[in-house]
Amino acid sequence: MEYLELNGTKEGLSAAVDDMWVLNATYLVFYMQAGFCMLEAGVVRAKNAKSIIMKSIIDTAIGSLLFWALGFGLAFGNADKASNPVIGTSHFFLINYQNLSFFAFQWAFCATSITIVSGSLAERVHVTSCLVYTIVMSAFIYPLSAHWVWSYNGWLRMIGFNGIIDFSGSIVVHIVGGCIGLVGTYLVGPRIGRFDSESGKPKPLPGHSITIYTLGAFIIWYGFYGFNTGSTLGISGGGIAIASRSAVTMTIIACASCATTLLAIKIKSGKYDVVKSVNSLLGGLVSSAAVCSLIDPWAAFIIGCVTSFVYLGCSHLLIKLRIDDPLDSSAIHLGCGIWGALSVGLFSTQENLSLVLKKSTNVYGLFFGGGFEQLGIQLLGIIIVMAWCFFCASILFTILKKFHLLRIEPTKELMGIDIDSAGGPAYQWDN
């Protein structure tokens, strides 16, 4: 933003406040990296805690540089012109780009999507594979998805009257990360000992610290208040009302999802399950990202309750298919992300949608009489983005597997990745 040109004017003050809002939201979104780091460290066994932290550092450091150099330009280059609807073609290395607060916010989103993948692949992949998928995701896969959905001239955004709507990234951030993680964990195979070799039944491989895991989840929840409210890109011109609604509905969705899971598991087994409840909470946050600004609080409660069963169903399906996802990242981010994106076409109200789009619209949620158009567009967008991610990830991880760069040797897996690749264990025990 060129503040010097607006200095001393009402527009200058408004622009400065809006950019400060976006920057503060960016700090919260970036703090989610600490949450994911703790979440992943807590769910793995102690012998792999240091390596999973190292992978989080790689995700952030390498991914950030690639997004600055290439990714942002591919995602948002020439976004203000009627140019290429498939890929951006300018602003690489931020050359001649002025709106740096927007770049910072989008960088934090990209970093979040990348870190989702490492949880799915935990405890059995080479550090090299983490480096490779981080480069490809930040420089190519994520940026094109973002361009199609979020760029002003992205082709999915231009379909129909409203275009696809993904307010804070259920599709662009979470479905992308969840899809790539699912492909990776399927191709790498389950951890040694996760399923019985004869019966195929799952065997528990509990993480070493439920305390760290839960702490990470609450840090992520805290960061989501920047993730969702910051997507207004300012508080002027009605932005504060949208942000307030987003914060409230997000909270209701997350809490309803968590509470439903708590009660459902208690009724079924007679006990509470901390991990499933925390995961359901995270699933609620993921579901809220697409729809939080477009719905009324009562609808948020319904969406949250349904999210619980979406998560539990997807988690159960992964086990049935013998897909070993240590963090249930695919169930949380892909499954709940799909539900959140579809909720836009079901529960968005005409008033809220018009406020967010800054134009009057007669296309809104099906349950409010807005017809099938928005739901159809949401479904199309989900299918397209998933197909893109599955295609790219399948090629990427197949190549890594062919050259023996995907999975570590069984002896090293049993010993723990920390000793082999991270310079020793995370915890030093006194003799």
Curated annotation (Swiss-Prot):
Residue ranges, Cytoplasmic side: 41-56, 123-129, 184-206, 268-276, 320-326, 400-431
InterPro entries: Ammonium/urea_transptr, Ammonium_transpt, Ammonium_transpt_CS, NH4_transpt_AmtB-like_dom
UniProt subcellular location: Cell membrane; Endosome membrane; Lysosome membrane; Contractile vacuole membrane
Membrane topology: Multi-pass membrane protein
GO molecular function (one): ammonium channel activity
Gene3D superfamilies reported in the protein's UniProt record: Ammonium transporter AmtB like domains
GO biological process, one term: ammonium homeostasis
Similarity section: Belongs to the ammonia transporter channel (TC 1.A.11.2) family.
Function: Ammonium transporter that mediates the excretion of ammonium from the prestalk cells from the slug. Controls ammonium homeostasis during growth and development. Ammonium has been shown to function as a morphogen at multiple steps during the development.
Designated name of the protein: Ammonium transporter 2
Species in which this protein is naturally found: Dictyostelium discoideum
